[in-house]
Amino acid sequence: FAMLNASGCNIGNFAMPFAQGFLGPVGVIAVSLFDCGNSMICLGGAYSIASIVKSGDGKFRIKPILNNLVHSIPLMTYIFMTILGLLHLSLPAPVVEFAGIVGNANAFMAMLMIGVGFHLNGDPSQIGDIIKILGVRYIIGIALALAAYFILPLPLEYRQALVIVFLAPVASANPPFTAQMGSDFGLASAINSVSIIASIVLITTALVIML
């Protein structure tokens, strides 16, 4: 459960708007490049590994991981569009227009799903789990953000973009994958919601300092 719900970064619904608003085209490119690897984790990678760990047989098998990745429609769509981009091909205008209409509902549907699933029963252990999982997540995230900003020999805009993505909330796909794995969907939604609030504070503070 912790492995799945501490992984991934919410790029499209969260980090990208910050990059567009404050960092401009270079920041958007940097965030998009980061999301190429991030999507592999968010859209099936973390779920596959967490499922293997939950099974408890102690055997690491690559076939189930690849099987889950291949059957992940969002990931396959992402890869398909990346290939089209590399080949300098584009979809017909009506398809792009329709996809844009559907895509505009993505953020709303993600937040609706998290809101519907949000459930805390008042058990102190749940609060403890949230603090423990997000504590580890943000300690690592802050350390990576500091390292990226002060150590990496990259242009300033790229380092600023990395700070944003490392401080981003956990992936919005985590709760449905948690439910699919048979774990606590309500707690996963609560972790996701709290991480959004924490990331707003952290990223806003970071932008004030960096800009």
Identify the role of each PLM range:
Residues 1-211:
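Alpha-helical transmembrane segments of multi-pass small-molecule/ion transporters
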